[in-house]
Every structure is written in C-alpha cells, then in structure tokens.
C-alpha cells in the first residue's frame, strides 16, 4: 500500500479527528453527496478541479468498502514486477482526500501515478477523461458492502459507531453514509463501463480466482508479465496474506481494513425483510443494465 509513514500519518490524523466527532456530525455535503469531515474538505474539492491527469495515470475507482486497498496493493505489485522499483505513495493515495495543496505537489510525482478514488463518475476531474487515463472500476455486491461499512464503523476504535446494524442499514439504503449512495455510484458508472480506457473488476471474481483476475489488469494497462510473475503476485495478494501484514502496511487500522473479505458475510446480519428491501432497490436501480448483469446479484445476494 502507501509508504507507511505517509499513510499512517494521514490515518492517525483522521482517527484523531474522529475521536471528537459524533456520528451525527461526521458528514458534510458537497454537490449533493455526503463525505466524512475527517478525510475530506470543501477546499480540497474546489482545488480538485485544477488537477491535471496524465495519460499514463492509473485510476482505481470504487465505492468504499469494495476492495480499493486490495487493488492498490495488486497494482503496486504489478508495477514493481515490470519496473523493479517499489511503488512509493508520496501522498495518501485517495485523490479527493488531503489538503488543497496536494495537487500542486502531485505535479512532481513520477509516472505512472496510482490514483484511488471513491468519487462518482461525474465528480471526477475532467482531465482524467480528456487525457485518457486508464481507469479500473472495482465493484462488490451491495449486501456485503453494507455489512463491511457496519463493521468498519463499529469495530475500529475512535470512529463514530452506529447504534445497531438496523441503523446502518437504514442510512446505507438512503445513501446517508460516506461518499453517498452505493446505487447512485453504480447508476452513474453503469453508463461508462464500456469505454476504451475503462476496465471493470468484480471483487467476487478476485475472491474466486485471484490469478485470473490479476492477469487481466496488466493486459488492460499494457504491461507484459509472465505466468510465473502473475502467480507470485497472486500468492502475495491473497486476502489472508494482506491481512497478515496489514498492521505493517496500514498501521493500527490495517486489521480492520482487511477484516474478513468473505463473500456472503451479509447473511450474518440481514433480516429477511432487509434482504427483500435490498432486492427491490437493486431491481429499481440496476435491473436490465450492463452493470446489473456483471454484479451477478442473484448468485451473491439472494438465498
């Protein structure tokens, strides 16, 4: 993941802010979407418009709790395999997080730059599309995503907790969580998944066959790796391997970022009524869409 000192320094500051923040005061709204005040500011969003993407930037777009830290590790290892240089993150890698001066500093960073983001498609800087940066879009089924949200808030010390799973579920379904609605994010990206510079990755596919999932990433980015290199990276990138070293790579929050990673963990918390509500929401927003088919909802979120 990121350079330990930079990553942990940013996370430590965010956790320190969280200590004094009640859940009811955790979010601010910018252009209609809720963001955590511990990680984002309106000044940084305003400065984001000045960000100048490069054609060889690698953008990792995902809704929160859908595997962004996992993909960051995988792409970093792919770059290392090609260049023989460990990828360094001079800034916290989430594009919209940090101070408003970060985009000026990023001009001096060497290529390729890895840029993670949880922004909806229409909130991304226009230069990403103008300069044809490569975009990996990572999705995870909405039921497990909601459960992961709940455990992150309620297990990590110092982060404001929800009173119950039912409370988190209500807020998740209304889109009143960090980075807004999962379904708005999905609807927004659905229209653009077939673009020449966009590659869709499903979290559940990586869990099922990590080596096959990893193999398609360098092919999309234009890297050549041998089968042996792919296999080595897949062994280093299993969820279990990531969890084992998470405290070294991500600091105290690491074990919570790599809590379980299981497909189907939602069954431990969802009531039958909540599952039906999620089914209806999915049908309303994504039934008959390209993304709806790619998410394999019937396989992962029903029964």
Swiss-Prot record:
Species: Gorilla gorilla gorilla (Western lowland gorilla)
PANTHER family per UniProt: SULFOTRANSFERASE SULT (PTHR11783)
Annotated GO MF terms: sulfotransferase activity
Keywords, alphabetical: Cytoplasm, Transferase
UniProt cross-references to Pfam families, sorted A to Z: Sulfotransfer_1
GO biological processes: sulfation
Enzyme Commission number(s) from the entry: 2.8.2.n2
Reaction(s) the record says it catalyses: thyroxine + 3'-phosphoadenylyl sulfate = thyroxine sulfate + adenosine 3',5'-bisphosphate + H(+)
GO cellular component, one term: cytosol
Functional summary from the UniProt entry: Sulfotransferase that utilizes 3'-phospho-5'-adenylyl sulfate (PAPS) as sulfonate donor to catalyze the sulfate conjugation of thyroxine. Involved in the metabolism of thyroxine.
Lineage: superkingdom: Eukaryota
Subcellular location as annotated: Cytoplasm, Cytosol
Name of this protein: Sulfotransferase 6B1
Active site: 118 (proton acceptor)
Family: Belongs to the sulfotransferase 1 family.
Chief site of localization: cytoplasm
